[in-house]
Amino acid sequence: IYSILGAIFIFIVICFGITAKDPFIIPIHTNDIHFTDKYDSSATLLIPAAYTLKDGTIEGEYRIAGKTYGTPTRKERISLHPTKGIVISGKWHSDYGFQQTVLIKNRKIRYHDDPHKRFRRALATVDGQLCILQSCIPMTLNQFSESIQKYCTNAVNLDMGDYGYGWYRKIKFSRIFKYNRDKQSNWIYIE
């Protein structure tokens, strides 16, 4: 138990040293990212993307290698574009993408009715580059959007739930208490 408390203490010190409301910003050094429904332990980047329903299916419409699956649950699609980063639009602009809660579009915050404070993660375009932004403390969606607005052109929420894990190179994204990979059914990845 002391090692867990020590890890939590270090995490809090690091977060509050940055300023609790400022997110961690992790640049992704390529726009060549994809969306997949296959777990790949050898991927350079692998983080949960769209919401996963209790039965393991992916919520909403999504695209893998140019084929569209699922049923739309929102008006907008999040295309993972090879030169533009993320494109938020009513139609697909690439062969890979998913539907998810839009946090920032064209530098404007989208407000949502979600009072729950949770750790948050987003895929965003920051200065023309794709980045992962993650909160240091639990926040509502609106608080998280407000904390990342100054950095982002566009940002979409990424599924964290109780199983928000993943990695980018040597950086590990994990919730402190749970690690239930079997519950996640889709990811953003780089080979």
Feature names for model-found ranges:
Residues 2-191:
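Gly/Ser/Thr/Pro-rich low-complexity, intrinsically disordered segments
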